């Protein structure tokens, strides 16, 4: 009898040991891609963003990452043209927090070291003045061809300023409220064929 009691006590000790273990901890995050589809091969000028932007706050630098945003430019040639100019201008760049705080972030846009501003045009190509567009140079070479010409380049996007409530500016992004900001960054492109 003593042996049975001792055996039952030992079994109870071994089976009860696992109960004191810590519970598993799991975390989950969701990645979201914006999705639309569009085809335009007849307009004189078509600019297509080649991706979307997603800024992440990095605690170690107390700031947001910057991103290269690629785009594709297609133009229809004009055989009577003697010069071609392509410019860009920032239209919208404010992201607003998706809660009641009213917090905003402003996105800066940079093209080859030059800020793209709302107040003026940034020259990307100007064949009359010898600005041939770097990665966009196929457009500078094909603007007077009888077919369509395409080229790809990119802007650098970064968070350049923010507010905690829509009016109070922050200099330290770590003081921003937690959450998600959303909005559009729009750049207008203007092409001019001179005959």
UniProtKB/Swiss-Prot annotation:
Subunit structure and binding partners: Self-associates. Forms filaments. Interacts with EcpD.
Function text: Part of the ecpRABCDE operon, which encodes the E.coli common pilus (ECP). ECP is found in both commensal and pathogenic strains and plays a dual role in early-stage biofilm development and host cell recognition. Major subunit of the fimbria.
Lineage: Bacteria, Pseudomonadati, Pseudomonadota, Gammaproteobacteria, Enterobacterales
Induction summary: Negatively regulated by H-NS. Positively regulated by IHF and EcpR.
Protein name, as recorded: Common pilus major fimbrillin subunit EcpA
Keywords per UniProt: Fimbrium, Signal
Family of this protein: Belongs to the EcpA/MatB fimbrillin family.
InterPro entries assigned to the protein according to its UniProt record, in alphabetical order: EcpA, Fimbrillin_EcpA_sf
Compartment(s) of residence: Fimbrium
Any one GO CC term of the record: pilus
UniProt organism field: Escherichia coli O6:H1 (strain CFT073 / ATCC 700928 / UPEC)
Signal peptide (from-to): 1-22
Pfam families listed in its UniProt record: MatB (PF16449)
Consequence when changing residue 91 to A: Decreases ability to form biofilms
């Amino acid at each position: 009898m003593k042996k049975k009691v001792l055996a039952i006590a030992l079994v109870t000790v071994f089976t009860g040991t696992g109960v004191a273990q810590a519970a598993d901890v799991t975390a989950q995050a969701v990645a979201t891609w914006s999705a639309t589809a569009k085809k335009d091969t007849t307009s004189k000028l078509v600019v297509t963003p080649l991706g979307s932007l997603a800024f992440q706050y990095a605690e170690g630098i107390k700031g947001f990452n910057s991103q290269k945003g690629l785009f594709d430019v297609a133009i229809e040639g004009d055989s009577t043209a003697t010069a071609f100019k392509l410019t860009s201008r920032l239209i919208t760049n404010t992201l607003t927090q998706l809660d009641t705080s009213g917090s905003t972030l402003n996105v800066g846009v940079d093209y080859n070291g030059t800020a793209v501003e709302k107040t003026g045009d940034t020259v990307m190509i100007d064949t009359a003045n010898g600005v041939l567009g770097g990665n966009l140079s196929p457009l500078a070479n094909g603007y007077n061809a009888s077919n369509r010409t395409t080229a790809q380049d990119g802007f650098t996007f970064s968070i350049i300023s923010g507010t905690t409530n829509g009016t109070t500016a922050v200099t330290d992004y770590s003081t921003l409220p937690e959450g998600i900001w959303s909005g559009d960054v729009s750049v207008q492109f203007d092409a001019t064929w001179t005959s």
